[in-house]
Amino acid sequence: MNLTVITLTSEKKDGKFCFFDEMKKIIEHSKVVIEEGDVLVISSKFISNSQGRILKIEKSKVCEKARKIARKFNTNEKFMEIVYRESDKIVGGVAGFAMATTNGILAPNAGIDKSNSIGTKIILYPNEPYKFAEELKRK
């Protein structure tokens, strides 16, 4: 069995776009041929971005529960409000991170990302990730 890893990149996008059209364009531009049995690994943030799951952190209104969690894990209250709102359950954490489940997936800060976004915007976890993966598989 042979394993070859090929990286495909895209410019950062700011706003909703058609994921499938963009992937088609990226693959065509790279001249990579996707064959039966190939495995695609796609960043959840790229999918979230395509769904428009981007928020401005400064617009968050902080509830008392999120304020307590932010103090406990020594993190920004407005950011923690979004983590709290997006998660199904906060199960623990360490300084700077709350471990949370979202759609049955355990991830730091409910999978919410500040590092791959522009300015004070944050990228949420994708809507219905399992359904999206099935749709991608069919296409």
Each language-model region and where it sits:
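N-terminal and secondary-structure boundary signal
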Residues: 1-139
